[in-house]
């Protein structure tokens, strides 16, 4: 995920104002104390991950249902009772996800092998799990996965060393070009 997406996700955790679709911060109807969570409707910035917002809304819904608390605001929106979440911004922004080069050996029984320069995705991505009495807990997991990839064909020579002449066999493989932290699907 990009730094701006994590900043937005952290804003969801801390109860900070989220950007509206116009790019200007939207003010809540009542002042918010630091470290509390609010359940409000916002026009999403295109960079806000939908899965993060859905998980957050589900979390707030669970809080309202379990606690039976919450106050209605002027617009009929429900504010959850204060839910402190002790997260530091640097903890959320410490994601690393890189495409590391390696030589992949493509082979098949009875064929010569071919070597292809490829990339593997390696890194550490954010996740959270919110326990509840509901059978389906709120889970948000990111994984370091390919963000850009392409298919390529590799030619292997098969049957070499036998009486028959060798034949070409084409095999398709994925070449990873870029990696990024993204939600698991």
Curated annotation (Swiss-Prot):
<protein>
    <recommendedName>
        <fullName>DAN domain family member 5</fullName>
    </recommendedName>
</protein>
<feature type="disulfide bond">
    <location>
        <begin position="111"/>
        <end position="158"/>
    </location>
</feature>
<dbReference type="GO" id="GO:0030514">
    <property type="term" value="P:negative regulation of BMP signaling pathway"/>
</dbReference>
<feature type="domain" description="CTCK">
    <location>
        <begin position="97"/>
        <end position="182"/>
    </location>
</feature>
<dbReference type="GO" id="GO:0003283">
    <property type="term" value="P:atrial septum development"/>
</dbReference>
<feature type="disulfide bond">
    <location>
        <begin position="97"/>
        <end position="144"/>
    </location>
</feature>
<dbReference type="InterPro" id="IPR004133">
    <property type="entry name" value="DAN"/>
</dbReference>
<dbReference type="InterPro" id="IPR016860">
    <property type="entry name" value="Cerberus"/>
</dbReference>
<dbReference type="GO" id="GO:0003281">
    <property type="term" value="P:ventricular septum development"/>
</dbReference>
<feature type="disulfide bond">
    <location>
        <begin position="121"/>
        <end position="179"/>
    </location>
</feature>
<dbReference type="GO" id="GO:0007368">
    <property type="term" value="P:determination of left/right symmetry"/>
</dbReference>
<dbReference type="GO" id="GO:0005576">
    <property type="term" value="C:extracellular region"/>
</dbReference>
<keyword id="KW-1015">Disulfide bond</keyword>
<dbReference type="GO" id="GO:0038101">
    <property type="term" value="P:sequestering of nodal from receptor via nodal binding"/>
</dbReference>
<dbReference type="GO" id="GO:0003140">
    <property type="term" value="P:determination of left/right asymmetry in lateral mesoderm"/>
</dbReference>
<comment type="similarity">
    <text>Belongs to the DAN family.</text>
</comment>
<keyword id="KW-0964">Secreted</keyword>
<keyword id="KW-0325">Glycoprotein</keyword>
<feature type="disulfide bond">
    <location>
        <begin position="125"/>
        <end position="181"/>
    </location>
</feature>
<dbReference type="GO" id="GO:0061371">
    <property type="term" value="P:determination of heart left/right asymmetry"/>
</dbReference>
<dbReference type="Pfam" id="PF03045">
    <property type="entry name" value="DAN"/>
</dbReference>
<dbReference type="GO" id="GO:0016015">
    <property type="term" value="F:morphogen activity"/>
</dbReference>
<dbReference type="InterPro" id="IPR029034">
    <property type="entry name" value="Cystine-knot_cytokine"/>
</dbReference>
<dbReference type="GO" id="GO:0030512">
    <property type="term" value="P:negative regulation of transforming growth factor beta receptor signaling pathway"/>
</dbReference>
<dbReference type="GO" id="GO:1900108">
    <property type="term" value="P:negative regulation of nodal signaling pathway"/>
</dbReference>
<feature type="glycosylation site" description="N-linked (GlcNAc...) asparagine">
    <location>
        <position position="39"/>
    </location>
</feature>
<comment type="function">
    <text>Antagonist of the extracellular signaling protein NODAL, which is required for correct left-right patterning during embryonic development. Antagonist of BMP4 signaling. Antagonist of TGF-beta signaling. Independently of its role in left-right axis establishment, plays a role during heart development, possibly through the regulation of TGF-beta/Nodal signaling pathway. Displays anti-angiogenic activity by inhibiting endothelial sprouting, migration, and proliferation. Once internalized by endothelial cells, may alter their redox and glycolytic balance.</text>
</comment>
<dbReference type="InterPro" id="IPR006207">
    <property type="entry name" value="Cys_knot_C"/>
</dbReference>
<feature type="signal peptide">
    <location>
        <begin position="1"/>
        <end position="23"/>
    </location>
</feature>
<keyword id="KW-0732">Signal</keyword>
<dbReference type="GO" id="GO:0017015">
    <property type="term" value="P:regulation of transforming growth factor beta receptor signaling pathway"/>
</dbReference>
